């Protein structure tokens, strides 16, 4: 580059740097304005929340505030009062970012003293610039947003209204916030406490709550998702698919088209468990139970057995198969041999316990049976032998003295239907000449 062109290059570079610096300064100003605006919008939301809480408080305590205020003397509502009554959360600060404190001044309307009107005013702290006041007044969503410029008058956003602070008994200074709550606004707040809202209002669950009984005038409640109640009285039918009860279900009667399932016991104090159509009681786990399929018999489901450690009683007890007893057969009534009886085949006993049987219409004593099929065994010392099934086995060989006590012939099971048992013999004697001679009879 020629030396005489170097001055122009330096000038161009300096101009470019100057433009960049101007753009940075301009952008920084815009960014700062944006941050300030967002901060003022946040302040406006906080004021709106506070005003909404004050509005609800007035609506809830409308009658009380009427009694404590006049057209010139206000009833004053503070942040502490709103927090203590639950209209503001306990974490809500007493002052805003500039140290200003909000209060609501409630007075009676001069034209209609039965109605209330109010103004929310901030006081103390550092004043806001006019730009901030104008911005916040437009962004306040509850009531009519405004601000105070001269310390005496509250002016609405876009200068839409102007009211002297003295009309509300309020005091403040320049650079502070004001919100007007008209008589219509507060009348609506009072009605809010008595009106049941069809839709949910965020932060106002009380608007969807009944405070007294409701009479539907014999009309219906349709398309109900869930009904939660402490008690219920119905003069007609209650129809449904499923029902869950943690306590008791009481009624004069109940009809179920399908099943009833209980996790615990089913009790009847003075009634019956009644079934129909050949049904009865069934244990689902083991497949047993009782039912009736005719007018005469109570039957066991699936021919299950009946087991009890107590007694089974009846006018008669019939076994189509064998009749077994694990102990003895006890006949309580007595018969007399030679007396008449019916039918043949009855078994009884006399007063001595001897067995009688009904034969040809007469009680007869059982004749002594003749034992036959005699079999003998020889058992030498130091041996044991199972002899077989007999009615009786005896040692017929004489062994004198001590050796007699060292032999044994005994049954080792219970008698069968023929009175026969398995017999066993033992010979514990020491000498080979002391063998046993055993005779068994059938």
UniProtKB/Swiss-Prot annotation:
Q: Which UniProt keywords apply?
A: Plasmid
Q: Which SUPFAM superfamilies match?
A: Enolase N-terminal domain-like
Does the keyword section mention Acyltransferase? no
- Xref: Pfam families: Shufflon_N (PF04917)
Q: Where is this region: Variable region?
A: 362-442
Sequence segments annotated as region (Constant region): 1-361
Q: Which InterPro entries match?
A: Enolase-like_N, Shufflon_N
Other comments? This protein is expressed by a shufflon (= clustered inversion region that works as a biological switch). The orfs of this region share a constant N-terminus, while the C-terminus is variable.
Q: What is the protein's given name?
A: Shufflon protein B
Q: Which organism is it from?
A: Escherichia coli
Q: What is the lineage of its organism?
A: Bacteria, Pseudomonadati, Pseudomonadota, Gammaproteobacteria, Enterobacterales
């Amino acid at each position: 580059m020629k030396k005489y062109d170097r001055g122009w290059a330096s000038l161009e570079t300096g101009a470019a740097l100057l433009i960049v610096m101007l753009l940075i300064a301009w952008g920084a100003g815009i960014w700062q304005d944006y941050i300030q605006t967002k901060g003022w919008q946040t302040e406006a939301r906080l004021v709106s929340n506070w005003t909404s809480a004050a509005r609800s408080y007035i609506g809830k305590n409308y009658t009380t505030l009427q009694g404590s205020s006049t057209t010139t003397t206000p009833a004053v509502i503070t942040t502490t009062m709103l927090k203590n009554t639950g209209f503001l959360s306990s974490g809500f600060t007493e002052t805003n970012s500039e140290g200003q404190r909000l209060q609501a001044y409630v007075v009676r309307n001069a034209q209609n003293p039965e109605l209330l009107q109010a103004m929310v005013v901030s006081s103390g702290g550092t004043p806001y610039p006019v730009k901030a006041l104008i911005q916040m007044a437009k962004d306040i969503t509850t009531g009519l947003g405004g601000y105070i410029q001269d310390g005496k008058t509250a002016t609405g956003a876009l200068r839409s209204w102007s009211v002297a602070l003295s009309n509300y008994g309020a005091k403040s200074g320049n650079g502070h916030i004001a919100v007007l709550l008209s008589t219509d606004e507060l009348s609506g707040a009072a009605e809010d406490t008595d009106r049941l809202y069809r839709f949910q209002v965020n932060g106002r669950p009380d608007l969807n709550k009944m405070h007294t009984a409701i009479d539907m005038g014999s009309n219906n409640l349709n398309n109900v998702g869930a009904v939660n109640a402490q008690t219920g009285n119905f003069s007609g039918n209650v129809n449904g698919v499923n029902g869950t009860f943690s306590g008791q279900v009481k009624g004069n009667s109940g009809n179920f088209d399908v099943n009833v399932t209980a996790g615990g016991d089913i009790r009847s104090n003075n009634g019956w468990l009644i079934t129909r159509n050949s049904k009865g009681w069934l244990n689902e786990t083991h497949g047993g139970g009782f039912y009736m399929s005719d007018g005469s018999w109570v039957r066991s489901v699936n021919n299950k057995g009946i087991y009890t450690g107590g007694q089974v009683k009846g006018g008669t007890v019939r076994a189509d198969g064998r009749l077994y007893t694990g102990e003895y057969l006890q006949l309580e009534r007595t018969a007399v041999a030679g007396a008449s009886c019916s039918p043949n085949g009855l078994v009884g006993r006399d007063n001595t316990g001897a067995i009688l049987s009904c034969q040809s219409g007469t009680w007869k004593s059982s004749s002594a049976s003749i034992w036959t099929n005699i079999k003998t065994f020889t058992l030498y010392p130091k041996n044991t032998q199972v002899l077989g099934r007999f009615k009786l086995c005896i040692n017929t060989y004489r062994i004198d003295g001590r050796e007699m006590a060292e032999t044994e012939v005994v049954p080792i099971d219970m008698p069968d239907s023929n009175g026969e048992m398995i017999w066993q013999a033992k010979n514990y004697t020491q000498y080979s000449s002391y063998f046993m001679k055993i005779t068994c009879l059938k």
